[in-house]
């Protein structure tokens, strides 16, 4: 954590840095395999020097304190031995001033000549990389991963799909928002051309043609503490349009005795999160809820996975609130499969179609 970061804690310096060796994640994967989990995709954050959300786009080599390239490769190889898939977090918008190649000439510039930025995330001071430059860095960095024996199944290009298109007024690389979406799309398309599954933070309609899956697509209340009142009745509008086009993983937390996110995963026919280990506390839905053992979470995920396997390529054709307060909801897929969730009683019913 850089001292200028909004998350830096000068009063508790021991909280500012955390290293989880690749070997620890490898052992965790072995434990998951021993529980009989057949399909796993591991999304790995903070795998490179000098840590999560730092010095992008110059994000290599693999973190030495975590085991370096050798430790990372061992983790990847173990994943593949079990038939699992491995992907990384990466970033080509947040442009950190500490990056060795940082050059403000490649940062997004406003018409008045100023360069917007902030110091909120772990890497401290940053601008925004003009997306005209992003494809170059993607190809450069992924070539380095390949050279070191890291066989990627997927890659997550952070924030590309949860932020609006950027504009740049630098006369050397003028960019409209439409241009920005095109360059971001080019990055995803290049990943796909290399056999790497593409993903980003959430899904915007412009990005659907480029993405295989996303990080998540939570309702807004899921990004706030569980005691925060909902602003309305959450319904899966996005899935009613795009369910058969992109995979959406859903949080599976039982956040309180009255709220279980598993029900939303079922209602939307999404994929489940088995383990989530968020970097920033109380941010992006990373709140402490009721503790669920890995064994119980595995069984919960089995139910959601079974439904997702049967409906992933099907349209979500109907959703309805069966009670006036929305506490009981039903969704139906194009083959007749239906899900009824009672959020008051915390129960569900699944009926499989043809």
Predicted regions and their residues:
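Active-site-proximal substrate-binding groove within the catalytic cores of carbohydrate-active enzymes
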Residues: 10-14, 18, 99, 107-153, ...
């Amino acid at each position: 954590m850089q001292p200028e970061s909004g998350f830096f804690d000068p009063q508790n310096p021991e909280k500012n840095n955390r290293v989880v060796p690749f070997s620890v994640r490898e052992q965790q994967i072995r434990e998951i395999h021993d529980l009989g989990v057949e399909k796993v995709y591991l999304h790995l954050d903070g795998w490179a020097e000098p840590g999560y959300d730092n010095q992008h786009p110059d994000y290599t080599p693999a973190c030495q304190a975590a085991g370096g390239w050798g430790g990372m490769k061992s983790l990847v190889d173990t994943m593949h031995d079990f038939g699992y898939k491995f992907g990384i977090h990466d970033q080509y918008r947040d442009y950190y001033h500490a990056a060795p190649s940082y050059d403000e000439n490649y940062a997004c510039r406003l018409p008045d000549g100023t360069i917007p930025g902030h110091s909120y995330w772990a890497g401290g001071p940053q601008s925004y990389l003009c997306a005209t430059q992003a494809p170059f860095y993607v190809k450069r960095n992924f070539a380095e991963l390949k050279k070191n024996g890291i066989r990627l199944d997927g890659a997550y290009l952070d924030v590309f799909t949860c932020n609006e298109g950027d504009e740049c007024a630098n006369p050397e690389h003028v960019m409209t928002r439409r241009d920005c979406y095109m360059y971001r799309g080019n990055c995803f398309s290049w990943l796909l051309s290399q056999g790497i599954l593409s993903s980003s933070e959430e899904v915007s309609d412009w990005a659907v043609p480029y993405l295989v899956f996303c990080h998540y697509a939570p309702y807004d209340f899921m990004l706030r503490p569980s005691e925060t009142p909902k602003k309305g009745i959450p319904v899966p509008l996005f899935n009613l349009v795009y369910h058969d086009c992109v995979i959406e993983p859903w949080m599976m937390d039982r956040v309180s005795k009255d709220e279980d996110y598993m029900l939303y995963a079922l209602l939307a026919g999404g994929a489940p999160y088995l383990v989530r280990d968020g970097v920033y506390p109380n941010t992006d839905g990373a709140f402490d809820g009721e503790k669920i053992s890995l064994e119980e979470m595995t069984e919960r995920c089995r139910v959601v996975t079974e439904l997702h396997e049967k409906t992933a390529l099907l349209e979500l054709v109907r959703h309805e609130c069966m009670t006036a307060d929305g506490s009981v909801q039903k969704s139906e897929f194009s083959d007749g499969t239906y899900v009824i969730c009672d959020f008051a009683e915390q129960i569900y019913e699944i009926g499989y179609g043809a």
